[in-house]
Regions:
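Short C-terminal domain-edge/linker segments immediately following a structured domain
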Residues: 37-40, 64-68, 130-132
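Active-site histidine-anchored catalytic micro-motif
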Residues: 75-78, 82-84, 93-102, 106-141
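Phosphate/nucleotide-donor binding subsite
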Residues: 46-95
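N-terminal phosphate-binding or glycine-rich loops at protein starts, especially the Walker A/P-loop
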Residues: 2-42, 98, 108-117, 121-128
Length: 141
């Protein structure tokens, strides 16, 4: 049996420890974990398979242009666009058997956009530090 390829999506600049722990758990369980950094401003202090620059490129822009938008919501929406395009490409090419996203309010919102763009039936898990936020309407959850 081939090891499942799990895409781990998170803001590596703020959740590096959590992402590293999740990668270790997945690898120990026999899966291949690929990390996609969906952060905008900070550099990832860990090795990632898909950088924030790769994500921006998948959205047809650059990370610098996203950061220059000057609006967190616009930046996260553009990042979500790139992350969704890249994740979908990985799924369609057989390089993603499931996705686990983790983060706080903004990363959870972004993860919901990404997971909704992926095929029905693909396992998707969102781990969030928030159970409720006025920034995330209940119908999004």
């Amino acid at each position: 049996m081939t090891a499942p390829a799990i895409l781990v999506l998170g803001t590596a600049d703020t959740k590096a420890d959590e992402i590293s722990f999740l990668r270790e758990c997945l690898t120990a369980g026999g899966a291949k974990a690929a990390i996609m950094d969906v952060g905008v401003l900070g550099e990832a202090p860990l090795a990632v398979d898909f950088s924030r620059h790769d994500v921006a490129r998948a959205a047809g822009t650059t990370n610098a242009a996203i950061a220059a938008l000057g609006d967190e919501n616009l930046a996260m929406a553009k990042t979500a666009e790139g992350a969704a395009a890249l994740a979908l490409e990985l799924c369609q090419s057989g390089r993603c058997d499931g996705l686990i996203a983790l983060g706080g309010t903004m990363a959870t919102d972004l993860a919901l956009d990404v997971t909704s763009a992926l095929p029905l039936g693909l396992p998707k898990v969102v781990l969030s530090t928030v159970a409720f936020s006025p920034l995330l309407p209940p119908e999004r959850l």
